[in-house]
């Protein structure tokens, strides 16, 4: 149970640059929703990687966050656990009325509900159902702007295929109800075959997402499409101590294909890629990608401020080279360079990450993401910079500072977060947030946008 809940102690999101016409995916970081979140794994959402970011029937970040504004919570109740072979999770949240004049956003008080029940089968399989009720973003009166979703999924998993191999088959289907007379196809369904093993790692998945599939408490990146993808990775290990095996731990060759069609069967996007990589005995890793993309823009698309791509088909090829140093060292380096064609022009992206651990007490990190676009419709430069500094006097007491700047919003943000765990479940937080905006009035400067400080004591009562 939680009453008058706020999440002031939560770490801020990492800023991202979006060069697609689809929404970005930001992971949940709030402890109240993270605890027991694995019980809501549904269909292929438990498969990891990109499948977490394509469709989730329940996505807890929809609760308490609407269009960048925080919606105050009146209460939150959650029950999760296992009864024999039955897994149960229920989340029920009541929100207060929101009247945000600055964002021109008015939302009435609401009740939001998500229920997930699954039954373990055999040793590693399961069958389950999910139900959600509520639309956090609706501005209509209670009951008039409803959004409900129901779904069923099945997983067959074994670790003894051919004696000692892993294999998983997932199938799922959902339907949602909400008042939209123009969109008739509210269903979604799909399957995934997965063979994740050491020498061969292969998977293939298919998904159908109706144009009316829009779960109020879920996440969907691309409705109104059918999609199929397949990947097969060959990962041999040289004989250690002989020849290449003295230096190389494992080779990777990973071809990948992905197709998107609209519901009338017309091809929208096709991606063909291959990703070679080498992991050395030291733990360092060198990798790359070669990718060919065909994409049809159904409308004029503003890829950056003032840079508009005309609707129509585009073909382009991109390349990536990357390096990641071993994590066992006190310092770590990660480098990625993307380059090649991008729609009607060219794009180059450089990612640099550095981290340093000093005797377990101090951590330092810096990340820079630099994008340079050169198109006939216009040029653009977009950058994100991040700095992290942590001081940990013990596993229970630490101070974390996080600074971010991007030149799209032109905002600089700083969060300082002190956490003291008195005992498991009982914590004290002292959090300070401050933001600035880069302006030219009349000279270049960072103008303060505001600050916010919070002192919070979190107590857990366990019967």
Language-model features, listed with the residues they occupy:
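Exposed, low-structure sequence patches enriched in small/polar residues
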Residues: 72, 160, 164-463
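Outer-membrane beta-barrel channel domains
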Residues: 2-245, 249, 291, 296, ...
């Amino acid at each position: 149970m939680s009453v008058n809940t706020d999440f002031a102690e939560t770490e801020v999101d990492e800023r991202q640059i979006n060069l697609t016409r689809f929404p970005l995916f930001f992971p949940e970081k709030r402890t109240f929703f993270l605890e027991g979140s694995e019980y809501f794994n549904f269909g292929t959402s438990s498969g990891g990687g990109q499948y977490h970011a394509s469709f989730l029937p329940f996505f807890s970040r929809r609760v308490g966050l609407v269009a960048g504004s925080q919606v105050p919570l009146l209460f939150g109740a959650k029950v999760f656990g296992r009864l024999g072979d039955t897994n149960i999770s229920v989340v029920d949240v009541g929100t207060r009325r929101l009247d945000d004049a600055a964002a021109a956003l008015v939302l009435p008080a609401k009740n939001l509900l998500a229920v997930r029940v699954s039954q373990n089968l055999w040793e590693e399989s399961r069958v389950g159902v999910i139900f959600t009720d509520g639309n956090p973003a609706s501005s209509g009166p209670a009951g008039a702007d409803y959004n409900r979703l129901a779904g069923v999924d099945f997983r067959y998993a074994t670790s003894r295929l051919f004696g000692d191999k892993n294999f998983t088959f997932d199938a799922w289907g959902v339907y949602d109800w909400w008042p939209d007379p123009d969109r008739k196809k509210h269903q979604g369904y799909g399957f995934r075959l997965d063979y994740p093993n050491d020498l061969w790692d292969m998977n293939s998945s298919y998904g159908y997402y109706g144009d009316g599939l829009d779960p109020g408490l879920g996440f969907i990146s691309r409705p109104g499409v059918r999609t199929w993808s397949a990947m097969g990775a060959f990962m041999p290990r040289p004989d250690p101590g002989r020849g290449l095996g003295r230096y190389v731990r494992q080779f990777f060759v990973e071809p990948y294909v992905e197709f998107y069609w609209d519901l009338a069967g017309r091809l929208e996007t096709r991606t063909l890629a291959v990703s070679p990589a080498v992991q050395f005995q030291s733990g360092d890793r060198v990798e790359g990608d070669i990718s060919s993309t065909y994409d049809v823009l159904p409308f004029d698309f503003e890829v950056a401020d003032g840079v508009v791509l005309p609707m129509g088909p585009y073909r382009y090829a991109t390349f990536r080279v990357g390096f990641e140093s071993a994590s066992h060292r006190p310092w770590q380096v990660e480098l990625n360079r993307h380059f090649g064609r991008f729609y009607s022009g060219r794009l180059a992206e450089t990612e640099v990450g550095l981290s340093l651990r000093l005797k377990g007490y101090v951590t330092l990190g810096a990340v820079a993401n630099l994008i340079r676009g050169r198109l006939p419709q216009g040029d653009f430069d977009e950058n994100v910079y991040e700095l992290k500094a942590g001081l940990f006097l013990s596993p229970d007491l630490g101070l974390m500072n996080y600074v971010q700047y991007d030149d799209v919003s032109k905002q600089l943000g700083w969060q300082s977060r002190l956490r003291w765990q008195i005992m498991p479940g009982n914590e004290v937080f002292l959090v300070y947030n401050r933001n600035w905006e880069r302006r030219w009035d009349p000279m270049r400067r960072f103008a303060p946008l505001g600050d916010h400080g919070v002192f919070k004591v979190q107590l857990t009562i366990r019967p």
